[in-house]
Amino acid sequence: KTLMHEHLLYGFCGFQGDDTLGPFDELEAIRENMKWLSGLKKYEFKTIVDATNNECGRDPFFLAKMATIMDLNIICSTGYYYEPASAYMYWKFRSGFADVETEIYEMMKTELTVGIGKTGIKAGVMKLATSNGVITPFEEIFLKAAARVNKVTGYPIITHTEMGTMGPDQARILTENGADPKSISVGHMCGNTDIAYHEELLSYGVFDCFDRFGLEGDLFHTPTDEERCDVIAALMKKGYEDQILMSH
């Protein structure tokens, strides 16, 4: 059993600057992760895909440590978050001097096939993200670069849709640029209860991922878990059960 979209650690971009009031406590993080990972093991889960982006607290050493402690397969990601909440300014600056799509392509391909920096740890999946109701030009650059990497290496792609929007557009851009639809999981689609919208996404042959169970209702401005389950049931009745993924 595999969970396709989880976060053992996560920090919104910029958290690294708050070492005074919000320092990282690794021992506390280990204890908290041991609690929920122990619960997963009771249900015979063996593999966890950690979808934390490069600039949002991704920590290959921590993931490797938790994999060893819990005797689980934990897969690390490579990629960036959606533009308003990420570190895109770095790439915007670099775009004045270089072909950033190619640089992003090389970065992700290297982290998948050689390793992340000098850690000796490889990523196993690409993680992309788009904004609420729009895909910005720089977000599209990342999608195109990931499609190129997938075409060459076969490594899978998982995505973040903000509030369940732009899923079909993500699938279109990725597949039009050569990505294999069977290796694409479009995430957070549980934020949308429009059955026709889900069918539009599924028409591309990609996976439709419902991965935010427990984060529901007015506090998170999302559908309830019951509404999400109703959507899954409706899609299964239409024959899409082989394209539906579920995670936390």
Model-inferred region functions:
Residues 3-11, 17-73, 101-121:
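Alpha-helical scaffold segments that flank or form the walls of functional sites
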Residues 17-28, 128-134, 157-162:
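Glycine-rich phosphate-binding "P-loop"
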Residues 65-69, 73-75, 79-156, 207, ...:
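Active-site gating/metal-coordination segments in enzymes
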Residues 58-73, 135-138, 171-183:
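Short, electropositive alpha-helical surface patch
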Residues 38-42, 63-71, 112-121, 148-151, ...:
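Acidic (Asp/Glu)-rich catalytic clusters
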